[in-house]
């Protein structure tokens, strides 16, 4: 995976968390920079760990699926991307995000971590997919974590001003990026077969 694809992947993986942080920021009466940085850091750490877990699972399964790994990567990324687009269009949030938004004064680190975990399940699935590609998983996880920390901090700070509309479109964009990366993975493999 080239650096541009890695950056796109990192920001695509941060869109769920960005949407959740906009909702969180919109619900808070006053958002302080330190609170936004703390929320961003928690989301970033969780989002960085999940692809590592998925990569470990995918690496174990690699010996069983090595002949069709590119197709699996394409299908998984396309399904994840499609789900993100559908969720953005339908404006449906997971229960953890709704719970966080209904308790705006509760800034418990555990509630933030639970919300971060709920929005990072797709990062674990992407980690499984990354095990099927030629990528430095540490670099990918760090990039995903940093992008998420940045996007969540900004989303929390801007939440009151921009509301939930941007969160919806961010999720749709993230889904389109994941589908595009899936197509690129499949194309690279098929182009490699054609030139062999």
Curated annotation (Swiss-Prot):
Coiled coil: none annotated. GO terms for cellular component: plasma membrane. HAMAP family: MntP_pump (MF_01521). One of its GO terms (molecular function) is manganese ion transmembrane transporter activity. This is Putative manganese efflux pump MntP. It is a multi-pass membrane protein. Probably functions as a manganese efflux pump. Belongs to the MntP (TC 9.B.29) family. Keywords: Cell inner membrane, Cell membrane, Ion transport, Manganese, Membrane, Transmembrane, Transmembrane helix, Transport. The chain crosses the membrane at residues 3-23, 39-59, 67-87, 109-129, 137-157, 172-192. It is found in: Cell inner membrane.
């Amino acid at each position: 995976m080239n650096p541009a694809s890695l950056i796109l992947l990192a920001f695509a993986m941060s869109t769920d968390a960005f949407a959740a942080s906009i909702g969180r920021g919109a619900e808070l009466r006053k958002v302080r920079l330190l609170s936004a940085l703390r929320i961003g850091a928690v989301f970033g750490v969780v989002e960085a760990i999940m692809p590592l877990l998925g990569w470990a699972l995918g690496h174990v399964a690699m010996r069983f699926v090595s002949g069709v790994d590119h197709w699996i990567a394409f299908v998984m990324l396309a399904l994840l991307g499609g789900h993100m687009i559908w969720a953005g269009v339908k404006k449906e949030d997971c229960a953890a995000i709704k719970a966080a938004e209904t308790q705006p004064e509760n800034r418990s680190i555990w509630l933030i971590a639970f919300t971060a975990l709920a929005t990072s399940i797709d990062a674990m699935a992407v980690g499984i997919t990354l095990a099927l590609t030629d990528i430095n998983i540490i670099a990918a996880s760090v990039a995903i974590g940093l992008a998420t920390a940045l996007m969540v901090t900004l989303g929390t700070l801007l939440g009151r001003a921009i509301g939930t509309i941007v969160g919806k479109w961010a999720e749709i964009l993230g889904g389109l990026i994941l589908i595009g990366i899936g197509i690129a993975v499949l194309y690279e493999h098929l182009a490699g077969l054609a030139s062999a």
